[in-house]
Amino acid sequence: PLYSSAASDVYKRQVLALSIASTEHPLQALAEDYVGRVLTKLDYVGVLAFEFFEVDGGLKANEIAPRVHNSGHWTIEGAECSQFENHLRAVAGLPLGSTAKVGESAMLNFLGSVPDVAKVTAIADCHLHHYGKAFKAGRKVGHATLRCADMASLKARIAEVDALIQG
């Protein structure tokens, strides 16, 4: 199996708001061990997303999603091969692509509405993904992915996008 970098997630009103891909997470190896055992037991093909909570220095599984997952959308621009492409490769029996990170990456969800598109796309290192869904309070209607050369730049870009989201 291949594993993507762990991501640290921030939730607002129980909905994923921000996901930051970690370069080196101290619990990455433990997470890969847990996930690997599940994949082997199920003889699983495709993308399987796990959400863990850090508890007392260990991990507790909260969600297992047998599909591409919102928390992995950062891979679209932030990995050599995105979760979407690797899912298609897996189910088609093709060789999997590298999940290696490209730079420092994050994803911010647009909930209920999409900020001014011109302002979002004017932010350096920012990529807009609009789902074309009807706007509804709390509904995921799009997201921005960020890919930067370093963590300081990433944090600055996150603040810029978040300011647009907050209005």
PLM regions with names:
Residues 23-27:
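A short, structured beta-strand-centered segment in the mid-to-C-terminal lobe
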Residues 32, 61, 84, 138-141:
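A general structural signal for well-ordered alpha-helical segments in protein cores
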Residues 89-167:
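Peripheral (often C-terminal) accessory segments that flank ATP-dependent C-N-forming ligase machineries
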Residues 12-22, 63-76:
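Short, flexible active-site loops
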Residues 1-7, 11:
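Single conserved hydrophobic/aromatic residue that forms the stacking wall/gate
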Residues 29-50, 55-56, 65-113:
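Active-site "cap" helix and flanking loop/linker of ATP-utilizing ligase/carboxylase catalytic domains
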Residues 54-58, 148-150:
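Short acidic-glycine loop/turn motifs at beta-strand connectors
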